[in-house]
Amino acid sequence: MNVFDFFGSAVCHQMAERSFFWGSCQSPLCARCTAIEGGIVLGVIFLWLAGRKDGNRPFSPSGMVLEALSFLPIAIDGVGSYLGFWQSNNLLRVLTGALAGYGLPGLFLLAANFSPAKENINPVYKNTGEQLILLLVAVAYGLLVWLGILPYFLVALVSAVGVVCFYGCFWFLILLTMTAGKKFPCFPLSLAGGLFTVFVVATIVQRIS
């Protein structure tokens, strides 16, 4: 098991029949998780580059609708295939995963920064167009993986970083809630917490599997 597979085991079942292959190299995550974590990485990069770490203004009505609808396909496909109504495939998995993953960082950021006791004027997204572009980029990433265009190392690296960011989002929410109104290096500590959590969870998974 390489380091990418180790990181992936912290969130994913890693079933071969639901994963991608580059020769003998299996993706560290299943198709759905690959797209989810890819979307998370893209969301984190966007919010960081756009300087939205203080975003606390609720989404616009259309933005909220888009965010809610983005989670609907993964719920329908997951439940429907689990109950045996249809057999899902890797294309459906990457599409539904990308739709769900891109918006998670924004939701965590809003949950961490929003305060009913003050005026929330800093946008997470300036408009719905930003969300839509981010969504389309996440879907494009998933399709490129599905088509086999992207190399193994890039997909594996993005997947591993995405797992760290996923757990890091929880740490960010916790740290910002605990240190509200105080200057505290929440972002780097959140990444460190995410990395630590991945190591602990993956180690436990390896021990019991």
Model feature map: region roles:
Residues 1-26, 31-43, 47-209:
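Secretory/periplasmic and organellar redox-cofactor proteins
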